[in-house]
């Protein structure tokens, strides 16, 4: 459902209006589509909240006189928000369809294979035996690096304490000299 970008009315097409620009506009990155979809969902939530706010603030015609101008203004805002909400849902449907079209050739990977397990049970499948070892090796390496980092920090602290004491002694000698 991609269409080439249209030039603004009354403006000449820019230098990028050639076939390459149109081809680039047609080939939209799936991640960009997902971002657009996320923004569209956020807009839908915002518009829905506005609709509920308008409905909450509207007075019911229960025999009380109300300003018809205010009522008409709120009614037009409500209708406008409903129209925009409908447009946003259509846009979200287009983005969803395009994402499914782009990801149609991909083989879905089971979630269990994406999560590295730490357990070393014999009951698990052999094809998942690699990730637990990788996760445990990575944790061991991180622990070693953290241990070395703590040792270096301790050494630096000792050096700073020694320098502080040395500066204190020098300042004391200079003070006694004067």
Swiss-Prot record:
GO terms for biological process: positive regulation of DNA-templated transcription; positive regulation of transcription elongation by RNA polymerase II; positive regulation of transcription initiation by RNA polymerase II; protein ubiquitination; RNA polymerase II preinitiation complex assembly; somatic stem cell population maintenance. The modification N-acetylserine is found at residue 2. Transmembrane segments: none annotated. Pfam families: Med30 (PF11315). Its main location: nucleus. One of its GO terms (cellular component) is nucleoplasm. Residues 10-22 have a biased composition (Low complexity). InterPro entries: Mediator_Med30_met (IPR021019). It is found in: Nucleus. Residues 1-22 are annotated as: Disordered. Keywords: Acetylation, Activator, Coiled coil, Nucleus, Transcription, Transcription regulation. The keyword Transcription applies. One of its GO terms (molecular function) is transcription coregulator activity. Expressed in brain, heart, kidney, liver, lung, pancreas, placenta and skeletal muscle. Residues 70-94, 133-173 form a coiled coil. Component of the Mediator complex, which is composed of MED1, MED4, MED6, MED7, MED8, MED9, MED10, MED11, MED12, MED13, MED13L, MED14, MED15, MED16, MED17, MED18, MED19, MED20, MED21, MED22, MED23, MED24, MED25, MED26, MED27, MED29, MED30, MED31, CCNC, CDK8 and CDC2L6/CDK11. The MED12, MED13, CCNC and CDK8 subunits form a distinct module termed the CDK8 module. Mediator containing the CDK8 module is less active than Mediator lacking this module in supporting transcriptional activation. Belongs to the Mediator complex subunit 30 family. Component of the Mediator complex, a coactivator involved in the regulated transcription of nearly all RNA polymerase II-dependent genes. Mediator functions as a bridge to convey information from gene-specific regulatory proteins to the basal RNA polymerase II transcription machinery. Mediator is recruited to promoters by direct interactions with regulatory proteins and serves as a scaffold for the assembly of a functional preinitiation complex with RNA polymerase II and the general transcription factors. This is Mediator of RNA polymerase II transcription subunit 30.
